[in-house]
């Protein structure tokens, strides 16, 4: 199998379901790479905007999936993905035998396993390809993708993934493995946010300018995008508009703990972050970026702002 990124692109008929902050940019990049896109979204405004860019718009998920080689979903949570896939007029009703559903949402391991079984019973194929990145990266086609599924399905969907991301990583042949990797990655991001918030609170309380702390950290031992990006957001108190909403972060924290419980793996840090999310939601911060959990660490330290 050729590496991702060097595969000669093949124009495909693609259904894309879910045109939110991430999905809209992803669908546009499919169009830019010459793919034919038929889209569906619950609310009409994002669909109308994508139609102006050249996509066809379907009235139902089943209609979108009808005639598609692959149907890609980018939706908020388990409930939305299950409803759009297996509910009345769901994509599974329209997807042809042999065609593939590619779930790109951050969903539970359990739902991914259920979708794989449901599609197999219908003679359809299934792969999971959740993404790492924020909305600006989705618009620029610079996402990172964790993909898992049967080798022939992964091979078939590569042109679409190459249009959406800068690099894809094949995790395995069981789709749910990609979902576990995605949940693990999001768990690590929340640990970074919490540790930065605590470090900024400590140094601020000690009378140190936190921007200097951030500069030192990110130009030496912590020169990674996640520290730079979230450190800058926290320092600037730039929690709105949200790149990833607090409520979604809390959802992912819950899902990683469910996965860990099933595998009998303790995640003590996940429990700490869970309480940060619950406190943030209790304070009315559900619409803010998930990095606003940093506000709670600042409050605990008696500091006026996280950075």
Indicate where each model-derived feature is located:
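NAD(P)+-binding Rossmann beta1-loop-alpha1 motif at the extreme N-terminus of oxidoreductases
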Residues: 4-74, 99, 104, 135, ...
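Hydrophobic residues within alpha-helices
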Residues: 26-27, 46, 115, 160, ...
């Amino acid at each position: 199998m050729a590496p991702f990124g060097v595969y000669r692109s093949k124009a495909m008929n693609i259904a894309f379901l879910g045109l939110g902050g991430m999905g809209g940019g992803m669908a546009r990049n499919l169009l830019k790479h010459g793919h034919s896109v038929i889209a569906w979204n619950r609310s009409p405004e994002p669909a109308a905007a994508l139609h102006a860019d050249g996509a066809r718009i379907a009235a139902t998920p089943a209609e979108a999936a009808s005639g598609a080689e692959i149907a890609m979903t980018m939706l908020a949570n388990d409930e939305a993905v299950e409803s759009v896939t297996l509910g009345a007029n769901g994509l599974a009703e329209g997807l042809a035998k042999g065609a593939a559903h590619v779930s790109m949402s951050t969903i539970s391991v359990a739902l991914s396993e259920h979708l794989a079984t449901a599609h197999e019973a219908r003679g359809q194929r299934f792969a999971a390809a959740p993404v790492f990145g924020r909305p600006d990266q989705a618009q620029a086609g610079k996402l990172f993708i964790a993909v898992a599924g049967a080798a022939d399905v992964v091979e078939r969907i590569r042109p679409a993934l190459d249009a959406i991301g800068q690099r894809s990583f094949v995790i395995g042949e069981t789709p749910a493995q990609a979902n576990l990797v995605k949940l693990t990655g999001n768990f690590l991001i929340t640990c970074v946010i919490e540790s930065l918030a605590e470090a900024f609170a400590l140094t601020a309380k000690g009378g140190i300018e936190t921007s200097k702390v951030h500069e030192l950290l990110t130009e030496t031992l912590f020169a990674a995008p996640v520290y730079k990006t979230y450190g800058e957001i926290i320092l600037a108190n730039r929690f709105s508009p949200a790149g990833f909403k607090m409520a979604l972060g809390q959802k992912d924290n819950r899902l990683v703990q469910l996965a860990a419980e099933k595998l009998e793996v303790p995640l003590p840090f996940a429990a700490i972050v869970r309480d940060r999310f619950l406190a943030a939601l209790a304070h009315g911060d559900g619409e803010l970026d998930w990095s606003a959990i940093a506000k709670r660490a600042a409050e605990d330290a008696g500091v006026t702002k996280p950075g």
